[in-house]
Amino acid sequence: MFLIRLSRHNPSSFTLLTRRLHDQTISSSRLRDLYNFQSPPPLSSSASENPDFNQKNNNKKKPKPQYRPPSSLEGVKTVHSDLPFDFRFSYTESCSNVRPIGLREPKYSPFGPDRLDREWTGVCAPAVNPKVESVDGVEDPKLEEKRRKVREKIQGASLTEAERKFLVELCQRNKTKRQVNLGRDGLTHNMLNDVYNHWKHAEAVRVKCLGVPTLDMKNVIFHLEDKTFGQVVSKHSGTLVLYRGRNYDPKKRPKIPLMLWKPHEPVYPRLIKTTIDGLSIDETKAMRKKGLAVPALTKLAKNGYYGSLVPMVRDAFLVSELVRIDCLGLERKDYKKIGAKLRDLVPCILVTFDKEQVVIWRGKDYKPPKEDDEYSSFIHRESSIDSDVDLSCSRGAQDSPDETT
């Protein structure tokens, strides 16, 4: 700005100033030639030649990459699981003996597309490849033996009575809040992951069972021990204490792929037929009308404990051929499951589900069943799954709801 103003006011002085600046630059270049002055090398070349400088730069923290939202276009790595059993949505409420007659949806895997190396058949993801040439190869006979060996390895030596009481005491409601809730869907596949997460921080976890699965607690205990390789050390009504085992290592827990959604249940044969076997149409109608008029044996509460329902029905069949159970307020699929379980456990014949009632018939040639046999797989103990009177009754009575009659 100063030079511009000077050139406007006095152009002669501006020319003199430029000549002086030019003479100074010439003199400085002459001094450089006279004294052999050399400028220092640039910083970039010294940094590349100095190894200590490069090492310091490498030790610096690398910048964090920018966040990229997940996209369905990116490939997902397929998960492999070595668990020796078929993956189902519910292990306690699904029966592998009854074959479905149809599917309500295409065979989309609930684990997600290409996320699991097992094929989804519409009902389960079998541990062995279902596409085999021979019929004998559909089910691997060594799976049960493999599960038994894995469980024995994890459990180690059996617990003493003092150790069992100590674990039960630690799992009371006044001691810990760790609990796994088991509802109308029973033992689901994702619930296995919840059990293993609790086993990271504690040796045992409390399992609270309510609703339809409590009708057959032996089935619940069997599948809990079979699928988690644990041990049920206490049972008080619908409250169980599941122990992880002496040799359990949380760092070596099995890989459990999670289900992303609940698959639709397949279509099974009808529970109530048009006519009851051995009776005519008129006799069937008369029996259904008579069954709805019979006094109710009990009224089931929603999300209650139904563990004493089977012996109640067996005792009622000693004096009456028809039994009615009031299920008012329960969902239709719930009391249908109750009827299906009673048919297999009592055993009996289903008559009707009308008016939210479960009416069952003992049959023509009824014989009182014998005492229940224990499951032949993993439940070999006599007293470990019984209720602990001193601990569970005093501290766990408030933890289990009473049955509404």
Swiss-Prot record:
Q: Which residues form the CRM domain?
A: 157-255, 277-373
Annotated transit peptide: 1-20
Query: What is the recorded name of this protein?
Result: CRS2-associated factor 1, mitochondrial
Q: Which SUPFAM superfamilies match?
A: YhbY-like
Name of one Pfam family that matches: CRS1_YhbY
**Higher taxonomy:** Eukaryota, Viridiplantae, Streptophyta, Embryophyta, Tracheophyta
UniProt subcellular location: Mitochondrion
Q: Which residues form a coiled coil?
A: none
